Every structure is written in structure tokens, then in C-alpha cells.
From Swiss-Prot:
It comes from Campylobacter jejuni subsp. doylei (strain ATCC BAA-1458 / RM4099 / 269.97). One of its GO terms (cellular component) is proton-transporting two-sector ATPase complex, proton-transporting domain. InterPro entries: ATP_synth_csu_bac/chlpt, ATP_synth_F0_csu, ATP_synth_F0_csu_DDCD_BS, ATP_synth_F0_csu_sf, ATPase_proteolipid_c-like_dom, F/V-ATP_Csub_sf. The chain crosses the membrane at residues 36-56, 81-101. The record marks 89 as: Reversibly protonated during proton transport. This is ATP synthase subunit c. F(1)F(0) ATP synthase produces ATP from ADP in the presence of a proton or sodium gradient. F-type ATPases consist of two structural domains, F(1) containing the extramembraneous catalytic core and F(0) containing the membrane proton channel, linked together by a central stalk and a peripheral stalk. During catalysis, ATP synthesis in the catalytic domain of F(1) is coupled via a rotary mechanism of the central stalk subunits to proton translocation. It is found in: Cell inner membrane.
Length: 112
């Protein structure tokens, strides 16, 4: 896994560090940057959604278990659960915003 990660970072470093004046080469570099941007956006959003789903599931399970043990605390636990779910969902939305920036407002793409 470390070798694959090192290879991916090395390829990304070459794509980002290369500087040229030839329009054909610059277009090829832009294609690589776009490809890596799509890969990063997809992986980042997928990991964020997976983590958010696991966190939301654990939060709901803990709230249901707490309400089953002490039904009088149900409304208070629900309020706390909704606040926690909003915070978890905010992290996924932040990942979505970063993915959209990487896809549509990429600062590494050189316009000609």
C-alpha cells in the first residue's frame, strides 16, 4: 500500500511541478491535473460520505439505546442527536465543497 501511495504521489508531483512553454505539453499537463482532480474529488467525497454514514449510524444507535434505558430522557437525547447529526453532515458538505472546487475552480490548471 505504501508503494502504491508513493507512486501516486510521485506521479502527482511530476504533474504539478512540470513547467513548460509549449501549448501541447501544457494541455497534456492540464489533462493529467483534471484526471487527478476527478480522482481526488471522488475518493475524498466517498471517504467523507462513508465516515459520515458510520458516524450517523453510531449516533442513532446510541440515542435509541439511551432512550430504551431511560425513556424520560428521550426528548433531551433526541435534541442532542439532531445537533450531532447536523455536525456530522456538515463535515460531508465541507468535503463536497472542496471536491467541487477541485473539479470546477482548480487553481493548478493553466489557462491559455
Amino acid at each position: 500500500m505504501k508503494k502504491f501511495l508513493f507512486l501516486l504521489l510521485a506521479c502527482a508531483a511530476v504533474a504539478f511541478a512540470a513547467e513548460t512553454n509549449a501549448p501541447v505539453e501544457q494541455e497534456a499537463i492540464n489533462v493529467w491535473i483534471k484526471a487527478f482532480s476527478v480522482l481526488a474529488a471522488g475518493l475524498g467525497l466517498g471517504v467523507a460520505a462513508l465516515g459520515g454514514a458510520i458516524g450517523m449510524g453510531n449516533t442513532a444507535a446510541a440515542t435509541i439505546a439511551g432512550t430504551a434505558r431511560n425513556p424520560g430522557l428521550g426528548p433531551k437525547l433526541m435534541t442532542t442527536m439532531f445537533i450531532a447529526l447536523a455536525m456530522i453532515e456538515a463535515q460531508v458538505i465541507y468535503a463536497l465543497v472542496i471536491a467541487l472546487i477541485a473539479l470546477y475552480a482548480n487553481p493548478f490548471i493553466v489557462l491559455q
